[in-house]
From Swiss-Prot:
HAMAP family xrefs: ApaH (MF_00199)
N-terminal signal peptide: none
Keywords noted in UniProt: Hydrolase
Reaction catalyzed: P(1),P(4)-bis(5'-adenosyl) tetraphosphate + H2O = 2 ADP + 2 H(+)
Keyword match Hydrolase: yes
Species this protein is from: Neisseria gonorrhoeae (strain ATCC 700825 / FA 1090)
InterPro entries per UniProt: ApaH, Calcineurin-like_PHP_ApaH, Metallo-depent_PP-like
Free-text function comment from the UniProt entry: Hydrolyzes diadenosine 5',5'''-P1,P4-tetraphosphate to yield ADP.
E.C. designation(s): 3.6.1.41
Record flagged with keyword Transcription: no
Protein origin, superkingdom: Bacteria
Family, as annotated: Belongs to the Ap4A hydrolase family.
Record-given protein name: Bis(5'-nucleosyl)-tetraphosphatase, symmetrical
Length: 276
């Protein structure tokens, strides 16, 4: 029995199939964690989502920003863009059932000393606190007022955590931290503009996992989201988004041995085509 984690797939289903074949994944005995952003921009978002649903006994996902975007569009709180590849899901006869399944998925998974989240965990949040906050947002996602939740979800404010935050401002910050965070100011404020490498990061920012006051070093945090960061295994974090969507690799890590396995992506998105 082996336990693997794989980074952002974003509809790159052929690469996922090849990677599972390369590691010899067995749905009967092995388990798989996916770091979120299972859909969108890659060519086979529908097939990837169907795979996750079909194998839910062996595959666990956390929600990423693109998965939440699919849910928002699906309930009328978002508009499709030229770069999106989620329309086949929305038009599928079972599209509603697939969205209901996706909406029931967690933002955070903890098993023993490991935690999986899409983007990261705020440095000042202990793991128990992060679990509790994830539960607040998950309750809204799964509740009767989920459409209103999606109507209030988008926005970059508040930028900093305050325990006194309430209502949708509180929920928005929680979701932004878990699904969009990369860089922080030295006051632990979220910065959504910076998306490049750590080496090129301006001096007034730092990666969320490099904050000196981190309260969650007692767990290994597995995440994706930051493709320009690439594979990283340091500071009690394992970063797994290695840019399959952009012509990079799709990466799996054996969580017991920390051995990584990669497959080269077949192609990559040419964003110039979307600018025409």
């Amino acid at each position: 029995m082996a336990h693997y984690a794989i980074g952002d797939i974003q509809g790159c289903f052929d690469e996922l199939t090849a990677l599972l074949g390369k590691i010899g994944f067995n749905h009967g005995t092995d388990t798989l964690w996916l770091t979120g952003d299972i859909v969108n921009r890659g060519p086979k978002s529908l097939e990837t989502l169907q795979f996750c649903i079909r194998h839910e006994n062996s595959v666990q996902i956390v929600l990423g920003n693109h998965d939440l975007y699919l849910l928002a569009v699906g309930c009328g709180e978002g508009a499709l863009k030229r770069s999106d590849t989620i329309e086949p899901i929305l038009k599928h006869p079972d599209g509603g059932k697939m969205l209901d399944w996706l909406r029931a998925q967690p933002l955070l998974i903890r098993e023993g000393g490991r935690v999986m989240i899409h983007a990261g965990i705020l440095p000042q949040w202990r793991i128990a606190k992060a679990e509790s906050l994830a539960g607040e947002a998950e309750a809204e996602l799964r509740g009767k007022k989920y459409v209103k939740f999606f109507s209030k979800m988008y926005g970059n404010k508040p930028a900093a955590w305050d325990e006194g935050l309430e209502g949708y401002a509180r929920l928005r910050f929680i979701v932004n931290a878990f699904t969009r965070m990369r860089a922080l100011t030295f006051k632990n404020e979220l910065d959504f503009d910076y998306k490049s490498t750590v080496k090129k990061m301006p001096p007034y920012l730092r990666p969320w996992f490099k904050a000196p006051d981190r309260q969650n070093l007692d767990h290994t945090i597995i995440f994706g989201h930051w493709s320009s960061l690439g594979y990283t295994n340091a500071d009690n974090v394992i970063s797994l988004d290695t840019g399959a969507l952009w012509g990079g690799q799709l990466t799996a890590v054996n969580l017991e041995t920390e051995e990584i396995t990669q497959v080269q992506a077949a192609g990559g998105i040419d964003w110039k085509s979307f600018a025409k």
